[in-house]
């Protein structure tokens, strides 16, 4: 009888360990981590033990079993509380990542104006790089502005670090070995920082970011003819050949280069039949072009309103639930991408999808892009990191960010999707040592104004002007 109770509790704990996200296992009040089923077993056993004590038949084994049950339930409760905390943090984190995603897309759309231009970016990787940089900037000035611009102002800075460094939050299944070819997506991530040989990095901040953020730091002679080729070769390998030629220019002013490479490959849950692919028109502002249009009829998650249609194309996975999908948002006749962006920014599209049979025509496409994000980031409130000649003093002194760029490639066909994105930040010396600027000429040889000013408050102690001497 008692062994059966222990086994029942242990079985429930094992079940909880295997499915910690199942909503029914959470009792929101008063003990969030306690499973109601475990409590029922516990109180039932206590009642039985009290009856035995009242009858004078309680044994030492009964008491030991009670103690063991308490221990099991307390430990399982602690486990559930921790996972519930992880779940709540993830919600906050995902909200920030998605908010920045649409904030960046809207800014890029505004920057394009009426220009017919494709955009391919990875907002999450840009956001992650900016979080990494925020650890090296002046915390009391630029860091808050960075976190505000990337939609993380309401989060504790230490938690921001924890979440962006922990791959479970940002990219589930990243850098995992494939369980079976063609099923679980291949997702790989590498972050590297090259700095000029002879420069000294702060050991404290190097240690604080190297392991948590999985950054490979390496000294490099940027003046060497092979330096650029070495970097391009590593990026090519990290992107599985999709980014064949990273478009960087190293000069004798280059002091550091921070590069983040994300690679993704997956097959569709519902494959497109190549025999059904036909040549069709693709219309754009001012004209049309011939494309290979794929076709499939199947049950998909789908949503539409008066402005746009939206569909979720799932990728194959070993997980019990979907882990990666491609969402397509299609403006209806008379509506533009800007209008759709405005709506999907506000709406939680993922919660609106319903199962529906859809006949889908989707163009087979390949996009290659190189996008300088410097001006867009300035618009989003990060002028400070580009204006300073000593932008990351906590790690490396006297360097200036020249540009932040994303260069990538995506291929979408009947089998699935393959994509890679390199996010890189080029840093120059704040004041090139080989180029000493000429002093500005100022000859005070005619009338002038003078002021004696208190530096902190700006209060003028004395002011005046001189007309003659």
What is each stretch, according to the model?
Residues 1-4, 62-65:
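Intrinsically disordered low-complexity regions specifically enriched for long asparagine
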Residues 3-23:
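Short terminal alpha-helical segments
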Residues 12, 66-67:
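Compositionally biased, intrinsically disordered low-complexity regions
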Residues 18, 23-36, 40-44, 62, ...:
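Secretory/exported precursors with cleavable N-terminal leaders
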Residues 52:
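Surface-exposed receptor/substrate recognition regions of extracellular proteins
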């Amino acid at each position: 009888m008692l062994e059966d109770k222990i086994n029942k509790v242990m079985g429930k704990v094992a079940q909880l360990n295997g499915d910690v996200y199942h909503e029914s296992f959470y009792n929101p009040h008063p003990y969030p981590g306690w499973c109601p089923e475990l409590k029922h077993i516990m109180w039932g056993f206590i009642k039985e033990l009290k009856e035995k004590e009242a009858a004078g038949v309680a044994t030492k084994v009964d008491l030991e079993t009670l103690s063991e049950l308490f221990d099991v339930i307390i430990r399982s409760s602690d486990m559930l509380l921790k996972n519930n905390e992880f779940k709540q943090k993830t919600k906050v984190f995902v909200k920030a990542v998605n908010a920045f995603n649409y904030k960046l897309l809207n800014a890029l759309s505004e920057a394009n104006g009426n220009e017919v231009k494709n955009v391919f970016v990875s907002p999450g990787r840009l956001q992650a790089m900016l979080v990494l940089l925020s650890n090296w900037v002046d915390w009391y000035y630029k860091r808050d502005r960075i976190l505000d611009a990337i939609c993380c102002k309401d989060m504790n800075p230490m938690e921001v670090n924890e979440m962006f460094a922990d791959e479970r939050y940002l990219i589930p299944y990243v850098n995992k070995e494939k369980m079976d070819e063609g099923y679980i997506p291949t997702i790989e991530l590498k972050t590297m920082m090259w700095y000029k040989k002879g420069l000294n990095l702060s050991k404290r901040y190097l240690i604080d970011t190297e392991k948590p953020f999985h950054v490979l730091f390496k000294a490099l002679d940027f003046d060497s003819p092979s330096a650029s080729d070495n970097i391009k070769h590593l990026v090519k390998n990290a992107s599985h050949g999709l980014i064949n030629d990273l478009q960087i220019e190293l000069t004798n002013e280059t002091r550091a280069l921070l590069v983040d490479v994300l690679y993704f490959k997956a097959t569709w849950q519902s494959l497109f039949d190549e025999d059904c692919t036909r040549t069709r028109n693709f219309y754009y502002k001012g004209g049309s072009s011939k494309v290979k249009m794929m076709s499939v009829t199947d049950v998909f998650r789908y949503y539409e309103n008066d402005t746009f249609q939206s569909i979720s194309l799932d990728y194959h996975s070993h997980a019990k639930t979907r882990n990666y999908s491609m969402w397509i948002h299609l403006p209806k006749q008379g509506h533009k991408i800007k209008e759709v962006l405005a709506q999907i920014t506000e709406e939680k599209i993922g919660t609106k999808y319903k199962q529906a049979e859809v006949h889908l025509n989707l163009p087979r496409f390949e996009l290659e892009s190189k996008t300088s994000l410097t001006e867009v980031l300035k618009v989003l409130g990060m002028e400070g990191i580009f204006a300073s000649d000593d932008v990351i003093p906590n790690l490396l002194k006297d360097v200036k960010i020249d540009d932040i760029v994303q260069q990538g490639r995506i291929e979408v066909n009947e089998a699935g999707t393959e994509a890679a994105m390199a996010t890189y930040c080029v840093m120059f010396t704040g004041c090139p040592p080989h180029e000493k600027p000429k002093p500005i000429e100022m000859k005070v040889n005619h009338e002038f104004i003078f002021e004696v000013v208190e530096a902190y408050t700006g209060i003028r102690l004395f002011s005046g002007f001189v007309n003659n001497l």
